[in-house]
């Protein structure tokens, strides 16, 4: 019985060793010689809130099997080229950004940062982050970093090791040494990345419900004048469209539907106090012709659109009593 047990254990150990070798064959750390990273942020959101933390690839990636006991993961980087300024090539506008490392600590040109620790090391792409301060009001478009982000990486990540003895993924020239003797960070490996920020068109819409009130006959419901406020991205003219509501009749005729039956009360919406219908397509309303602040596209000033809602049902007085309502969708088009 004892002899069989010993043979079984020996076979298990051999099998375990084979599995370990197979996994290590797929493990590696690498530094990207070139790459492009881009983030997107809506323009009004950027101005009001900024962008707290958008992730991008730092250039260092480690993948595969790692089994280490009582071993230090050595990791250091030095920033050799970078810019906190991003430029829109079409307009010349600038965005200011803050770059942070995987510990959410700000990095700067020429900085050398030791991130060594008793861990298994990175698992996948090691992230960096971009933070955009609030208060920046810029046109939509692509903003490219004024210079690439060049980082020199120094690393020694344990794959399989016990107390300094084993297999390590290492940057060029790295030497762990022994007992503190012969340690050398080596020459490192360079990553070079191009960063860009895409600022998206964005708007804020302020609209209120229209209430005709109550009348004995629908024909006695007076027209209601209201106003809608819209502000959009810097240097971005736009159009405002209204759809035909939930229950259009005879094509594009807007109509309110009874809450209790299948009857309708026709109405429509007109620009300012005119008979110029506000709709979609050729009936859109240009921001250049807004009632208040037309053509002011600075991202801060609101355009106001005064409109009049009228009952237009020729048979309004035959419509049964009840509560009628509709929902109209506002669409901003750039």
Predicted regions and their residues:
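Short proline/glycine- and polar residue-rich coil/turn motifs
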Residues: 115-124, 217, 294-301
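Surface patches in mature domains of proteins
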Residues: 87-102, 252-276
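Outer membrane beta-barrel transmembrane domains
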Residues: 269-293, 302-303
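Bacterial N-terminal signal peptides that target proteins for export
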Residues: 2-13
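A surface-exposed loop-and-adjacent beta-strand signature within N-terminal beta-sandwich domains
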Residues: 81-123, 279
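N-terminal small/polar-rich segments of proteins
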Residues: 26-84, 129-144, 148-264, 301-334
């Amino acid at each position: 019985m004892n002899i069989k047990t010993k043979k079984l254990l020996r076979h298990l150990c051999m099998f375990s060793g084979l599995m370990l070798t197979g996994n290590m064959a797929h493990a590696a750390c690498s530094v990207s010689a070139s790459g492009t990273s881009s983030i997107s942020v809506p323009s009004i959101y950027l101005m009001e809130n900024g962008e707290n933390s958008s992730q991008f690839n730092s250039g260092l990636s480690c993948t595969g099997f790692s089994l280490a006991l009582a071993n230090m993961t050595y990791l250091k980087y030095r920033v050799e080229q970078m810019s906190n300024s991003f430029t829109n090539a079409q307009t010349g506008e600038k965005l200011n950004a803050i770059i942070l490392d995987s510990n959410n600590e700000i990095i700067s040109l020429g900085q050398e940062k030791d991130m060594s620790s008793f861990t298994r090391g990175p698992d996948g792409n090691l992230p960096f982050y971009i933070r955009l301060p609030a208060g920046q009001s810029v046109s939509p478009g692509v903003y490219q970093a004024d210079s690439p982000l060049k980082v020199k990486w120094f690393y020694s990540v344990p794959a399989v090791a016990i107390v300094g003895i084993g297999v390590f993924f290492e940057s060029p020239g790295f030497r762990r040494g022994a007992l503190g003797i012969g340690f050398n960070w080596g020459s490192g490996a360079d990553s070079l990345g191009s960063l860009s920020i895409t600022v998206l068109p964005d708007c804020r819409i302020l609209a209120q419900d229209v209430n005709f009130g109550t009348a004995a006959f629908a024909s006695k419901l007076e027209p209601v004048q209201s106003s809608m406020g819209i502000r959009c991205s810097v240097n971005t003219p736009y159009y405002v469209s209204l759809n035909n509501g939930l229950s259009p009749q005879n094509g594009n005729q807007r109509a309110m539907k009874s809450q209790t039956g299948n009857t309708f009360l026709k109405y429509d919406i007109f620009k300012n106090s005119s008979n110029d219908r506000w709709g979609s397509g050729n009936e859109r309303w240009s921001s250049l012709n807004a009632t208040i602040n037309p053509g002011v596209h600075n991202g801060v000033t609101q355009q106001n659109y005064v409109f009049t809602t009228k009952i237009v049902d020729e048979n309004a007085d035959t419509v049964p009593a009840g509560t009628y309502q509709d929902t109209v969708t506002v669409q901003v088009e750039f």
